[in-house]
């Protein structure tokens, strides 16, 4: 059974369900999740898209390096969080279970790499319709990801950020206004921005 370690998956489902599609018959839908872990976020996104748009060519990209990486998870001034590199518990057995769980999802494309490796390896992908940012929680990393994906978005694209109170979301949202993104709703843990133009 596909599980998750976060909260507000109901909000994630609602934001996918109400994703604006500005074409009667879109030629393709492309979604992404950075930081897959056990996979519930990706499952919610794919289930909502396939239920809403059956028959439309669809691909969901899942990015996660797994492997118990040692890295700094949070900004230095994040209250209650370590400001030094720590080892995550993203084990190879967790990855194998996730791959097995998604074997029934033909639209699921797993990229076993970091966000930076993915962005460098796939500069021509897009446009993305929905991105769930649940990977690194440092402001500089979230900004880098956001700008990369914003350059590969279109009108109606939605970005959802998990654990947004752990980094400078105000800076991220401000930078995304350049691309036409506006905040449409904020929960306690997740926030959704939509490209309006």
Task: Report residues per predicted region.
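Phosphate/oxyanion-binding active-site loops and adjacent basic polyanion-contact surfaces
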Residues: 4-8
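S-adenosylmethionine/decaboxylated-SAM
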Residues: 9-197
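S-adenosyl-L-methionine
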Residues: 1
